[in-house]
């Protein structure tokens, strides 16, 4: 009962934060599409609320490049990000990622050329790359594998939520066209980026490194959840292709690792990842 109450507190308080971060990441990644189009044409031949294409003198092809350049760094930095998070913990790393992409998103409103937009999008991909694997890692500190599926599906709803109202939000923000001499599309980036920065600052105080440092849990709940995490949940013979030796895994509940499983050196983990066929199957489905 105590353990269930503790997991319920995590579910009610931590998962909504994960959903919000994922929602903001998705909005900040995709709101450039809302900034593309011009407003209505005026009788004098000018355009009311010009879009980013007109403001930066970009062609549709150049704009498609701006959409694409985000993904190379987005894909490449996911693995390094999760190696970093193991060293410094989710409490610092996840809010830092959100703070970084929030700043980059805000600065996107200041770009004055297509080259500047390309560079901004590259750094946006770099900053957002670690969020999904980072949140997934954080959830593994609280839930056993059979419980993760629903929790992951829950925070992935952030993408669906963003699609339901991000367009309406961008349309409303673009009505600020002309205020302080800024175009409407610039205000979209300013407001949404600043809001992400504000949420990131709050997250420094509410995202834990694991059960041991989770403020919403009592000492007994923390110990029960940690004990539950490291109870056997599958047999070694169920995972022969991973070539994981049980003797290489140990449990050391210290203040540094928050009671996480200490696995073999990171390069062995990386090697096992690259030879796991499920990684490639999942990647194909995602593509």
Question: Model-predicted segments: where are they?
Answer:
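Residue-level signature of mid-helix packing/kink "hotspots" within the transmembrane helices
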Residues: 71-79, 129, 164
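Extracellular/periplasmic helix-loop-helix junction of adjacent transmembrane segments
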Residues: 33-75
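Central mid-sequence intracellular linker of multi-pass
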Residues: 8, 145-159, 174, 178-272
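Hydrophobic core of transmembrane alpha-helices in multi-pass small-molecule transporters
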Residues: 104, 116-130, 138
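Single conserved hydrophobic/aromatic residue that forms the stacking wall/gate
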Residues: 1-7, 11
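Helix-breaking motifs and short loop linkers at transmembrane-helix boundaries and internal kinks
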Residues: 28, 57, 88-89, 110-115, ...
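Membrane-interface helix termini in secondary transporters
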Residues: 51, 82-83, 172
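Conserved MFS/SLC helix-loop-helix module at the cytosolic interface between two early adjacent transmembrane helices
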Residues: 76-115
